[in-house]
Regions:
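Arginine-glycine-biased low-complexity disordered regions
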Residues: 44-54, 61-82, 87-142, 146-265
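Structural motif
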Residues: 33-37, 59, 174
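Short strand-loop junctions, especially beta-strand C-caps/beta-turns
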Residues: 6, 59-62
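Conserved interdomain hinge at the start of the Helicase C-terminal
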Residues: 1-54
Length: 265
């Protein structure tokens, strides 16, 4: 793949600001795919970007199968220029079914602490349609790693969503102070596991000027404060309820148009 690799050193609390600045200032070629590590982060980032009139969709583990397929279809058709996707290695969900943000998976249901609502989930959602693996994201020009990938293999897998079919691509990774050792290990080991990356190098992303970011800081911090845990939790519940209602309609659509669903796998 013909990919240019960049890093942006940023404090964790400034990731929302820097991601918004990249997209708002038009520094990322469309379409762009933003990888995060938690469903809550995906929802919060989507809500945050919407406040700046940046329309995007979010793809994460808690959405019904048919809704995921529909969201991916819209992204591939160009309805959205930006997609936020939860990476395969999702720390927010552990082995006993606990989910980040105060919910718990019991069988095929999501139980939320906020309302006690039981939200039915497609029982085969993760087995048949993983958020990232096996999905064909079409014509992605830029990958943004909002959260630093866990290792070199994960990095290659995520940035490999761009630069396909002979096209050029760009990968931008946010590196917080706690991620410095992780990104150093990624840079060291990538040539060992990818024969095409012998000349691999992570370069500073210099197109984003500090003064341009700072000009957006005041409003960004004000907006970020308004999207706390409670707001994310409420949005998460509303989103899942809405998508579950839509899921039956989408299931009927895909049953009538099986070719559309098969193209997404």
């Amino acid at each position: 793949p013909r990919i240019e690799h960049y890093i942006i050193k940023v404090h964790t609390d400034d990731k929302l600001l820097y991601c918004m600045a990249l997209l708002r200032l038009g520094l990322c070629d469309k379409k762009s795919l933003v990888f995060v590590s938690h469903a809550d982060t995906a929802i919060r980032l989507r809500l945050f970007l919407a406040k700046f009139s940046i329309s995007c969709c979010a793809l994460h583990h808690e959405l019904p199968y048919n809704s995921r397929a529909h969201i991916l279809q819209e992204f591939n058709r160009g309805v959205y220029d930006y997609m936020i996707a939860v990476s395969d290695d999702m720390p927010g969900q552990n082995n006993n079914g606990a989910v980040s943000g105060g919910g718990k998976l019991v069988g095929k249901h999501l139980i939320t602490k906020a309302s006690g609502a039981k939200l039915s989930r497609h029982k085969d959602i993760d087995k048949d349609f993983g958020v990232v693996r096996g999905i064909d994201f079409k014509r992605v020009r830029t990958v943004i790693n909002f959260d630093t990938p866990s290792d070199a293999s994960a990095y290659i897998h995520q940035v490999g969503r761009t630069g396909r079919g002979g096209e050029e691509g760009t990968a931008i990774t946010f590196v917080s102070p706690s991620d410095v050792e992780k990104i150093r290990a990624i840079q060291q080991h990538i040539p060992d596991i990818d024969a095409n990356s012998k000349a691999f190098a992570l370069k500073p992303f210099e197109k984003l000027a500090v003064q341009d970011v700072e000009a957006l800081r005041y409003r960004a911090e004000d907006v970020a404060r308004s999207i706390g845990r409670a707001a994310v939790r409420d949005a998460r519940i509303r989103e899942i309820r809405s998508e579950l209602l839509n899921s039956d309609r989408l299931a009927a659509h895909f049953e009538e148009n099986p070719d559309e669903l098969s193209l997404l796998k």
